[in-house]
Curated annotation (Swiss-Prot):
GO terms for biological process: translation. The keyword RNA-binding does not apply. The keyword Ribosomal protein applies. This is Small ribosomal subunit protein bS21. PROSITE patterns: RIBOSOMAL_S21 (PS01181). Keywords: Ribonucleoprotein, Ribosomal protein. PANTHER family: MITOCHONDRIAL 28S RIBOSOMAL PROTEIN S21, SMALL RIBOSOMAL SUBUNIT PROTEIN BS21. It comes from Photobacterium profundum (strain SS9). It comes from the Bacteria.
Amino acid sequence: MPVIKVRENEPFDVALRRFKRSCEKAGILSEVRRREHFEKPTTVRKRAKAAAVKRHLKKLARENARRVRLY
């Protein structure tokens, strides 16, 4: 749980913005959304594998684009 200390003479809006930013960096909202409903283990594995394939294809595309630019 992110904790911020409100500085002296700091407006509430600024403190709230800092708190929201720290929550975003900690990934709290995405974790809550992920745990909102039960997800079957097979679905979790399937989604993770699809993400890995997508990352791999993206990496290959970047490497291929780099090779094309060298010529």
